[in-house]
């Protein structure tokens, strides 16, 4: 993806090195205006269409109080707009600053919190809790794009600053501080360490949705949450060759060969 003017502006205001320091210290960072107004509106319209389609087809994945919240998985298959988010130049640069040059996209999903909740939706968790503790180093990074303003009232993501340094899931040991909400304007990109304790927040508003697109990236030797080899639309690999490595279709060092041999991509 060509870096947009909005992304270039964001880099000029907060260099990747400064973002990296913020991530190392607090476990999270907010980058305002990562999406410009046109990009934001395009993604919003595409997501709203998908939500309506899933509802009409009876396949909407709803959760939380009264089913007010909705999740959509495998967003790469749902539109070019979401491929562009997964390959967002600034987002990938920040991810690689922590995980190294070779990364995989573990999942890409939409998460919408609906109004009227009366309790927190998500349980505090990390995104590398499937690995033995204590963790030797960071193995995952999350990138979220705010499609609406994320506020104290409408379900902004909860995080525990500094909790990535505990090297354990939230159930093990005492959190270093109380949870806070990642608030920001629509178009903001939030990035957080996969070890950071976080959760979906409670939407206390009577009539507001909180829409976001969430990507998780991992080191290349880990298994992805979404099995792209089974679910990815193969035509996307022709249109977006960069997805081949990002979705685990390429070898990495001695892993992922075919019949013991290395090859570029897979033929279907």
Regions found by a protein language model. Give the residues of each.
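A structural signal for short, well-ordered beta-strand segments
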Residues: 107-110, 143-145, 213-217
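Short, hydrophobic/aromatic alpha-helical segments in well-folded domains
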Residues: 81, 94, 143-146, 199
